[in-house]
Amino acid sequence: MNIGFKTRIYLGVGLLVTISLIVLGTLNILSMKEKMVTSLVNETQNKLSFHVTELEQLMQFRINAIATGAEQFDPSLSDADNQKLVNLLAKSTGISNVIMTYEDGRNYMSVESSNQFDFRTRDWYKTAKVASSVVLTDIYQDKVTGEKVVSATMPVKQGGQVVGVLLGDIQLGEIISTVSNMRFAGGAA
């Protein structure tokens, strides 16, 4: 079959246009893919930074609440006043359990328990007693609630002398739940 000159030109131009469109389309797809991946990575990093900051602020708020709360306790307070203070501190900060233990053995908890405890023998009490500021414990199983917790402890001082220790339990399950509920592009944490 004989193809005329005009037909050859038309076929050549058509082939060049087709090849050009395929090459440009492929380059465009690759470019868009790169931009989408970069955008997705940036968005995920921004959300992660936001959530990390949010968790840090929550923890810092609770640590500061224990530090500030320790200034309110005094061995001369009545049992009712001590109990009101630990309950108020727990409810207003979202701390799962607040415990105030005095050197004379009295203790007040925001979580009701029929058991009597001598918290002065606990490692967290001994560590906080010699500290000058808030101390965070390692993760441990709380004997009162049975939950895994991290505790913020602060010595309570009167006239420069330690008269007790204030503790606030932060449940590990709450932190894990908060992290699990974080949503990112394409899934969850």
Question: What kind of feature is each model-predicted range?
Answer:
Residues 10, 28-58, 175:
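Juxtamembrane interface helices immediately C-terminal to a transmembrane segment
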Residues 20-21, 37, 97, 104:
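Alpha-helical transmembrane segments of multi-pass membrane transport proteins
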